[in-house]
Design a protein with these regions (language model features):
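Membrane-embedded alpha-helical bundles that constitute the cytochrome b-like, heme-associated redox core
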Residues: 1-130
Length: 130
């Protein structure tokens, strides 16, 4: 007669001692919101650039000088770099297990922020230059 097996511990029992899961829900939700926002914004940008296909610089500047395209490009930049920062944060937190984790996270956020600011300022510069 086989020996009785011990019951398999529940998921909650196996997760005890691994820390709180509350902190990650906001980042998880933000990553999903930015991903959903990026879909229509990216499709719009691709369609707009295809429509501008053979246009010269003056036509592009005139297009970006309109309020709606400028706003949508800025929203795309904000969503893209927030999404990038969140995704890289997850990768760093999951795979870097050394003292380099915190400096890497700070560097990642600073770079994403700086590149986003440069993109937004460049968009505004083109949009308001007439």
């Amino acid at each position: 007669m086989p020996e009785p097996r011990e019951p398999t511990p529940s998921i909650a029992a196996r997760a005890r001692g691994l820390g709180s899961a509350r902190r990650g829900t906001g980042a998880w939700r933000a990553e999903r919101v930015t991903a959903v926002a990026l879909v229509p914004l990216t499709l719009w940008l691709v369609a707009s650039l295809v429509a501008l296909g053979g246009a010269d610089r003056a036509a592009f500047v005139a297009w970006l000088g309109r309020p709606l395209p400028a706003l949508l490009v800025i929203l795309l930049l904000l969503a893209a770099f927030r999404h990038t920062a969140l995704g890289l944060q997850v990768v760093i937190e999951d795979y870097v297990h050394s003292a380099a984790k915190i400096p890497l996270l700070i560097t990642t956020y600073l770079l994403c922020f700086a590149i986003c600011v440069v993109g937004v300022l460049a968009t505004l510069s083109v949009a308001f230059r007439r």
